[in-house]
Every structure is written in C-alpha cells, then in structure tokens.
Regions:
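Glycine-rich nucleotide/cofactor/substrate-binding loop typically near the N-terminus or early
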Residues: 1-43
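Internal alpha/beta core interface subdomains
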Residues: 32-133
Length: 133
C-alpha cells in the first residue's frame, strides 16, 4: 500500500549519523533504532510499462518508499550499506564473506554510487513514460 514505509523511525534510523551527538540524542529521545543495512527491491516500473498495463497500474508501480530508502541509505553511506537491487546481492555476499561480515567506507561508497545509479535510472524511466503521455 501507499501508506506504510515512510515512517520517521525508519528514516531516522537510516539517516542518523553515528558520530553526531545531536542525532544520537534524538535517536535516544524518540527510541529510534540504528539501521545499518538497507536492502531494496523496487517495484518493476519498466516491466509494467512494457507489459502494456493500464495507466492506473503503471502509476501504482511508481515506487516511493523504496526509492526514498535507497536515497536515505546512500546519503548516509558512512554508516549504512545500501543494497539498491537484487543485482547487488552477490556483491554484498562476496564482501561479507571475505571481510567477516563487515564493510568498510570504500564498500559503502561503492554501494552508494550504485544506489544513486539505480535511483537515477528509475526516475529517468518514469520521466520518459510521462514525457510520452
């Protein structure tokens, strides 16, 4: 549904900087848990368009919560690993296996770069669909 993912405890847990006293105080005050791994599988917008679906079905496949989670995780790459698509699962698994279930800043930057690429591609596909209307 449309009204479930966009919650301040979720986004607070992703966006809170672990080295920022103010952020940490707010997390404690509002009982917000830290989230250090975000894995997203966006609605299949392009496949829905390609299937010849109705405009209503296409509109419903515009992912809002997922894309917001991707952007939040990528923004806080210093503290969060963002896995923006199923295509990234093998890469994450390889890193975790090699490094003992840990990531470093370079790993997180790489995932953030991939995340903004996924976000950009997704938004471009939506833009292109609207431009053809």
């Amino acid at each position: 549904g449309r009204v479930k993912t966009l919650h301040p405890k979720i986004f607070g847990g992703i966006l809170a900087r672990r080295d920022n006293t103010g952020d940490q105080e707010q997390m404690k005050e509002y009982d917000i848990p830290a989230i250090d791994l975000v894995i997203v599988d966006l609605y299949p917008f392009e496949q829905t368009v390609a299937s010849g679906a109705s405009e209503q079905d296409i509109i419903e496949k515009i992912d809002i919560g997922g894309i917001s989670l991707i952007r939040a995780g990528a923004k806080n790459f210093k503290d969060v690993v963002i896995v923006p698509s199923k295509a990234e699962y093998p890469l994450l698994l390889d890193i975790l296996n090699k490094k003992g279930a840990k990531t470093d800043i370079e790993d997180r930057k790489m995932f953030a770069e991939h995340a903004f690429g996924v976000s950009s591609h997704y938004d471009t596909a939506i833009h292109n669909w609207f431009a053809k209307k």
